[in-house]
Amino acid sequence: MLGKILLLNGPNLNMLGKREPDIYGHDTLEDVVALATAEAAKHGLEVEALQSNHEGELIDALHNARGTHIGCVINPGGLTHTSVALLDAVKASELPTVEVHISNPHAREEFRHHSYISLAAVSVIAGAGIQGYRFAVDILANLKK
């Protein structure tokens, strides 16, 4: 393998397929990981996936990926709109990072319109369903070339 991508999913994303399927669809977190892993394999890359409902675990994963991964795909969930600490961890990781949202936050409640993470992201993908993860992996693979 030519490198590893860190795939991070934040709070409540373990509930994909069950929580608000009218917004997030019926695909599960396992479907997301399988899709990202398959796309990465096409580029000779691996995926290391972590979902956590705890901000500190996501921060630790970013710190640990510094210098060992080629990039990060992150769906921070609700932390998108609140976490300066997660933004700082993305910056500290020095990884090219693609922010993904299954739904389009800009078409939802006002408080979802601001993203701290996007300040450090090389790209933001929103509203493409779980296909956004595939697009994100492809972006990172092409940045690596």
From Swiss-Prot:
Pfam annotation, one family: DHquinase_II
Catalysed transformations (reactions): 3-dehydroquinate = 3-dehydroshikimate + H2O
GO biological process, one term: amino acid biosynthetic process
Annotated substrate binding sites: 75, 81, 88, 102-103, 112
Sequence similarity: Belongs to the type-II 3-dehydroquinase family.
Top-rank taxon: Bacteria
Transmembrane segments: none
HAMAP family: AroQ
Alphabetic keyword roster: Amino-acid biosynthesis, Aromatic amino acid biosynthesis, Lyase
MF-aspect GO terms: 3-dehydroquinate dehydratase activity
Lineage, top ranks: Bacteria, Bacillati, Actinomycetota, Actinomycetes, Mycobacteriales
Class in the EC hierarchy, top level: lyase
Enzyme Commission (EC) number: 4.2.1.10
Binding partners and assembly: Homododecamer.
Function: Catalyzes a trans-dehydration via an enolate intermediate.
Pathway entry: Metabolic intermediate biosynthesis; chorismate biosynthesis; chorismate from D-erythrose 4-phosphate and phosphoenolpyruvate: step 3/7
Protein name in the entry: 3-dehydroquinate dehydratase
